[in-house]
Design a protein with these regions (language model features):
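Alpha-helical cap/lid subdomain in secreted, periplasmic
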Residues: 1-136
Length: 136
């Protein structure tokens, strides 16, 4: 899965496991898949920090936000309890004062980020990597 290389960090972003469809995974299944991924990463990269980027709230999947937030909470707890696992929060940055997704950060499909959305997303990632000493 991951070739023998030295990484400063590994970033993981998953957004399609819970989309509001019939075939959605449960929050528990999403956590289980992440734990499997981490075990696979650890085989060749035992000390490399792994950063989970929170599944970003989107207007088009807002109807599934309860399950998405539950999965995010489970993964945050897992990261908090394990060394070299980090959780990059995005929810607060992508929601407005009413607590719903800020539609100005998304393309017309209200699922994918636009330029401003990606700029904000990149800032959150860079900030976390800097806080952990990965980036200057």
């Amino acid at each position: 899965m991951i070739r023998p290389q030295t990484f400063k960090a590994i970033l993981v972003f998953v957004a399609n496991d819970i989309s509001g469809g019939e075939d959605d995974r449960t929050p528990g299944e999403v956590l289980k898949l992440y734990r499997i991924l981490v075990r696979q990463i650890r085989v060749r990269n035992p000390d490399t920090p792994v950063f989970w980027i929170e599944t970003t709230p989107t207007p088009s999947r807002w109807h599934a936000t309860g399950r998405i937030r539950t999965a995010n909470r489970k993964i945050r707890r897992y990261c908090d309890r394990n060394p070299d696992l980090y959780f990059i929060g995005t929810h607060e940055a992508f929601t407005g004062p009413e607590g719903t997704p800020d539609s100005t950060l998304f393309r017309s499909d209200m699922l994918h980020l636009n330029r401003d959305g990606y700029r904000l997303w990149a800032e959150l990632i860079k900030q976390s990597l800097s806080e952990e000493g990965i980036l200057p």
